[in-house]
Amino acid sequence: MADTIPHNTFDTILVLDFGSQYTHLITRRLREINVYSEMLPCTQKLADLGWKPKGIILSGGPYSVYEEGAPHADPAFFELGVPILGICYGLQELAHRLHADNVVAGTAREYGHADLKATKFGGHVDKLFENIEGDMTVWMSHGDKLRNLPEGFHTIGTTQNSEYAAIAHKSDPIYGIQFHPEVTHTPQGGQLLKNFAVGICGAEQKWTMAEFIGQEIQRIRSLVGPDGQVLGAVSGGVDSTVAAKLMTEAIGDRFHAVLVDNGCMRLNECEKVQEVLQEQLGINLTVVDAGEQFLAGLKGVHDPEQKRKFIGGKFIDVFEDEARKIEAKSNGKVEWFLQGTLYPDVIESISFKGPSQTIKTHHNVGGIAERLMRGHGLKLIEPLRELFKDEVRELGRQLGISPELVGRHPFPGPGIAIRVLGEVTREKVEMARQADHIFISMIREAGIYDEIGQAYAALDPSRAVGVMGDKRVYANIILLRAISTKDFMTATPYPFSYEFLSKVSTRIVNEVAGVCRVCYDYTSKPPGTIEME
C-alpha cells in the first residue's frame, strides 16, 4: 500500500485507543485546531510505529485496568520522552502502571456533568488549565477511580466525587484527567486539548487542507511516476469526486475515472455525474453500463453480506475489463487503483474492540482493493485515507468544486442495492429510487438539505395491508432515514416536523406504484448503522 502519510510532514499527536466510543472525537478536536492527530489501537507497539509523535494521548475505555485481560499500552511509549495525557481509563492506566493498588472500583459511578476546581502549583504543572478561569464544567463517565495519588504527582483538579479528577507529574509533562475534554458536554475541553497539544507538546498548527493539497499532489506524482496510469471508481458522491479531482490535478488524463452503472443508482445519476465530472471538472471519465450484469447476479440473493460480496466482486470484474481497454489505448500500464477511503472507515477497521465481531463488511475498505491488488497486480492509492468527512469537503472547496456538489450527501458504493432489504430486483430498485427522489427533493425544497448529514429512502418488501381507492391492497413499505452527524461515527435521527413527514408520506404513497405505507427510522448510531444493510 502506498503509505506516505501526514505524520511524516506535520507535527502529530498520537491517540492510543482503549475502546472508548469517544476516542475518534479526540482526533477530530485536535484537527479542528489545525494540529494533526492520528489514532491507533492501544495494542500498537512502539517498535512498529516508524515515526515519533509530538505527544501521546491515552483514551478512555470500558475496561477496568486492574482486571485480568485489561488492555495496557506498550511500556516503551512511556520511555519515549514526549508529553502524555491520560483521559479517563488513560488516567487510570498511568496510575496503575506505577502501582497496582492505585486504582479501585468506585463506591458510586460518576456519569454526567461535574464542576472541576483547578489547583495551581506553578511551572509546567499549570499549563494544562491555562486560559481556563474559574470552575470548569466537565463530563464524567466512569465507575473506577484513583484510590491513591501516584508517587511523584500533584493533584491539579478535583470534583465533588473525584478527589483526583486531574493530576500532573511534578517534573515530567505527564498528565491525567478523569473527565472527557473531547465531548461537547465539556465546554472548555477544546482549550484543554489545545493547551496539551500546542502549549505542552509544542505541536505547530499547520494542518490545513491548503497545505495538504500541495503535499499530496507531490506525493501522488512521486508514487505514480511520469508515465504511470491510475484507474479509479467514481460515483458522483463527495469522496470519489474529490479524490478524482485531486488525482486529475496531480497527473491529468493519466487518471482514468470509471463510473459503473450497476442498475442501482439514484434517479438520472449517471447523466448528472457525467456532466459534472467531464464538463465542469475536466476529469477523464468512462461510463460503463453494467446494470443487467449486476441485477442478474443479485437475483435470489437475500443475505446482506452476500449482496455486498457479490457487488464488490462484480465491480472488480468490470474494473479489470476496463483496465485492459485503457492499457490497450494508452501509453502506459495501469498500475494503480484509486480508492476514496476516509479516516472514519479506517477507524472502524482499526479501533480496539477486544473480542468483538465485524458488524458488516465496509464497502470502502478491504475486498475490492485486495482483489485488484492480488489478481490484477494493481497498487492501491488512497489520498483521502487520513481525512474526516468535513476535511474532505474543505479539500473539495479548495480544489474549486461547487458548493452544491461538495455538500452532497454520501451515497454507498453498492447503491440502492443495500437500501432494498432482501432480494434486489429491478422493480424494487425503481420503487426505492422514486421514493428517494421525492424525499430528497422535498428536503431541498424545505431548505434543510444542508442541515442533514445523510438522507435516503429504502424499501422493505415485507409488505403491509393498506386501503387505496376503497380497495384492500397488500403492498411494500418505504423506510425513510435521515441523520444529523458531524463525522458519521455517531449519528442521531433528524427531527423532522410531523407536517413535513406527513407530506412526504402522502406523495410517496400516491406517486410510487406498489407502496402503501411509509415509516421514518428514528434509530441513532449506535445502535443502528446509517445504511440499512
From Swiss-Prot:
Pathway: Purine metabolism; GMP biosynthesis; GMP from XMP (L-Gln route): step 1/1
Domain Glutamine amidotransferase type-1 intervals: 12-206
Required cofactor names: Mg(2+)
Domain GMPS ATP-PPase: 207-408
Active site: 88 (nucleophile), 180, 182
Top-level taxon in the UniProt lineage: Eukaryota
Residues noted as binding XMP in the record, renumbered to the chain: 308, 470, 525, 531
Cell location: Cytoplasm, Cytosol
Glycoprotein recorded as keyword: no
UniProt GO MF annotations: ATP binding; GMP synthase (glutamine-hydrolyzing) activity; GMP synthase activity
PROSITE patterns linked: GATASE_TYPE_1, GMPS_ATP_PPASE
Reaction it catalyzes: XMP + L-glutamine + ATP + H2O = GMP + L-glutamate + AMP + diphosphate + 2 H(+)
Gene3D superfamilies to which the protein is assigned, alphabetical: 3.30.300.10, 3.40.50.880, HUPs (3.40.50.620)
Entry function: Catalyzes the conversion of xanthine monophosphate (XMP) to GMP in the presence of glutamine and ATP through an adenyl-XMP intermediate.
Name this polypeptide is given: GMP synthase [glutamine-hydrolyzing]
